Amino acid sequence: MATELRCPDSMPCHNQQVNSASTQNPEPQQAGDLILAHAGGNSDSAATLTLLSGHAHSSVPAELDPQASGGATFNSENNGGTGNYDAPASDSLLGDCEISRQIGAQLKLLPMNDQIRELQTIIRDKTASRGDFMFSADRLIRLVVEEGLNQLPYEECMVTTPTGFKYEGVKFEKGNCGVSIMRSGEAMEQGLRDCCRSIRIGKILIQSDEETQRAKVYYAKFPPDIYRRKVLLMYPILSTGNTVIEAVKVLIEHGVQPSVIILLSLFSTPHGAKSIIQEFPEITILTTEVHPVAPTHFGQKYFGTD
């Protein structure tokens, strides 16, 4: 059963308009490095993308699905239809080398394996039942949340076992919280609570203005001491990046530094990741896949409104 959130009524709400050729490839420098070469450059313009471990998985297709498009009705990230968001045609993980360099240290990918690939496949499959979709989404969310917790600071501690022995272990440093970007980000809340029972969770509501299509903050409510906490920002699909950018701006207004924000997502386009890192170079993005086509039907199918 999902836990009802109770945040202090004293926190401010926001209602404001927000303006928002091939070359010879170099060798990886160390295990876990993925070399990204500029399509029109030379070996000096290679960039390194940080992987959490092991294997690099290429997920950029030779061509995009011609039917992968949809109109935006909820916000600038999630399209209302069942189609997918197409990143700009020129956008690719192998595109702008300078941006790839900036992404390198901040963008973290879960190591690809068959289990994760299957979950991604079911989530993208338009014929998947809602039950299968939710089951797969919850499993993938749990994997992302677990790795997100691994990015938080720990401290050493000593405990006594039932047999009387001393054990040197670690524990979370105090001062962590979650923030979900409504509505699709709420799908990740239970996964976080399953791992951290007592963690505080705030919310931000951002929608696209029907006339200008610009992101607009309608509501924000956080723990009163959020400026002292590490923040796990939850938003499953990064397509344009606009919604996340506005959410981070609201967090900054409440005293949160971008360097303590870890963005948890399931899927990201190259354009979305680049946009966020360009705006906030210190933020950390954790995702399972960077792909030009984002499954922006996620929120509608997860909550049964597709």
Curated annotation (Swiss-Prot):
The keyword Methyltransferase appears for this protein: no
Residues that hold 5-phospho-alpha-D-ribose 1-diphosphate according to the record: 183, 235-243
Gene: UPRT
Pfam families named among the record's database cross-references: UPRTase
Cystine crosslinks: none
Gene Ontology terms: cellular component: cytoplasm; nucleus
Xref: InterPro entries: PRibTrfase_dom, PRTase-like
Species, as recorded: Bos taurus (Bovine)
Keyword DNA damage: no
GO molecular function, one term: ribosylnicotinate kinase activity
Binding positions (GTP): 130, 139, 173-176, 200, 229
Sites where the protein binds uracil: 296-298
UniProt biased composition (Polar residues): 13-28, 70-79
Family: Belongs to the UPRTase family.
Domain of life: Eukaryota
Protein's UniProt name: Uracil phosphoribosyltransferase homolog
Principal location class: cytoplasm
Alphabetical keyword list: Cytoplasm, GTP-binding, Nucleotide-binding, Nucleus
Chain intervals for the UniProt region annotation (Disordered): 1-28, 58-87
Record's subcellular location: Cytoplasm; Nucleus
